[in-house]
Amino acid sequence: MPPLPALAISAIVIAVALAAGAATSWLLAPHPSGAFARCATAEQLAPRHYAAPPPMCIDPAASYQATIRTTKGSFTVDLLARSAPRTVNNFIVLAEHGYFDQLHFFDNRSWVIQTGDPLGNGHGGPGYDLPPEPGASGGWAPGSLGMARFPDGRISGSQFFILKQAWPGGNPTVDYNRFGSVTRGLDVVGQLTSSDTIVSVQVKRT
């Protein structure tokens, strides 16, 4: 058999390396298990970028709790699956796939802090928007979690905010998808700044 041309050999080496890299990335990426084993994202188009919101995999009648570990410490969130099922489902699926890991709290104000943007500038997201869930609006006490809205009114698929204090002037004048409430560690939330990041998000069915 004659020797392969140098270019052909190089192409084979590159292909094998790329395949190995893809396999390694898949192995290192978090994979849902247990109660969330069937929670899958839509088709992944690029890192942290998907074709559509994830299909429903949670039970809206069940109770879910998230522990968000940050560089300042951890806090616990009760997720409002009954009033915001699609928003909670989206949050759980992204969390189970490690979407929020290492993302900065890029927008820090005296009364609110925001995260969930892979670009870290308020313009990024998972490639899709969420539908409004007005049943989850209202009750904006300190510790409330809501999905951010873009200036054109679209609801972000990944950016969310946490109230450190009461909403200035009372409740917001537009509807946000309120999907959770901090039940433990609100003092940690109050200490977060734009230099802090999410280390991990762990969700359990309670």
Feature-to-residue mapping (PLM):
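Cyclophilin-like peptidyl-prolyl cis-trans isomerases
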Residues: 1-206
